[in-house]
């Protein structure tokens, strides 16, 4: 174990030189005894054995490195550092550690941030702190030096003093790709057009006849201008969707008529032409596996799916199409039909209406009833029983409504004329007596109307199945009484037809949307707009 003196550099140096001298003496002594011992001592294999014979101090000296040829350069201002290597270093980790003195008292003290918030100090800044006051003479000298440098040195000139800024670049019109000599004073605008060829809407007759074979109205979706007035049968194929779904080569155009605007039939559709056509619509000539073969329009003439069209059944198609067009569509109003078909089936519809009283349900004014909704009941059996029949009844009633419009028109005119003459005669003879009698009649009619509405509303309420017979009997008696009165009035109208003095008011078509179909009814005046059947539908049920 070495002491502190051995650790000093001077002690190590003196010890090194003494050991080196002793080593040289021993080597000389060993060389005199024999060369073999020196060689064995120099080999690395037996160098350890030779060292074991020496003292432990000798072993430590052998491990020391040899001295260097050049001395290490040291800092002359730190000559005393070599003597202080055995002492603690100056740059110790705890030398610059901040030491906080212990608190002299344990009382509460405010922090500096809290003190600044509680009692802030008013610090008034000096006036010269914000504005700068340079020396004008010094600033002028500096500016002169800066300007002299930028003027004398070879640098890019400033854009402000550039002479090109004053001269405007004016291009000649001849240098442009589009010359404006022809259109001087006009301003043009670029726009995209569909084709380079532009035709006016009204063409000369010769050009129109030359372009007629190339006209394809079914691709354009419609025609306009003179083409629309001169083209024959082009309105049939004006639907692009029909052109995509079906093949219209087998369609036979039966006729085309202009719809006559009359006060009896006021339609909501803007369609002005009535076109009748028959045929088989399909995608291809064979029709197998196509969309047209699956469509019910293909079987319009009653032919099987695989039967080809030979063109010999045009008469049969025409008859079937007329029969199909007689029935109005539940979606489109019946005004789309031609007046010829309506007049041809008036008598047949009246006879069928008399046979089926329960389907017509005519009111006291001779107009068809508007209540087409089925009876509402809480029983699911009744709903399943009358679901199919209710739809058939709606379609049948729609047929009656569409065919009974013309007779009801003349019938209402006759009734209004008769009532008008009776009222004038009664007013001239006995005004006071008739006023009392009219009040009594109004009270009686109101009581009868309330009774009818009560019975009809009770039929629509949630009642047991046992009351259905009584309700159906009352409804049948009511419809029979109305139909009997209708027959008597019609017989009188056939015998004597009084002249029309006052023209009838314009009819307004009403459409019901609660039953799922657009149902129509004709109203003579505003006073007759409240129908008994509609009042029955809106009256709540009070029967227990």
Swiss-Prot record:
Tree of life domain: Eukaryota
One MF term in the entry's GO annotations: protein kinase binding
Compartments, record wording: Cytoplasm; Nucleus
Modified how: Phosphorylated by aur.
Amino acid composition bias (Low complexity), ranges on this chain: 450-461
Protein's UniProt keywords contain Phosphoprotein: yes
An annotated GO cellular component: cytoplasm
Acidic residues: compositionally biased ranges: 422-445
Start and end residues of each stretch annotated as Disordered: 28-55, 348-391, 422-480
GO BP, sorted A to Z: activation of protein kinase activity; cell division; regulation of mitotic nuclear division; regulation of mitotic spindle organization
Pfam (any one): BORA_N
This protein's UniProt keywords: Cell cycle, Cell division, Cytoplasm, Mitosis, Nucleus, Phosphoprotein
Keyword RNA-binding: no
Polar residues biased stretches: 30-55
Family that this chain belongs to: Belongs to the BORA family.
Subunit structure: Interacts with aur.
Function comment: Required for the activation of Aurora-A (aur) at the onset of mitosis.
The protein's name: Protein aurora borealis
Lineage: Eukaryota, Metazoa, Ecdysozoa, Arthropoda, Hexapoda
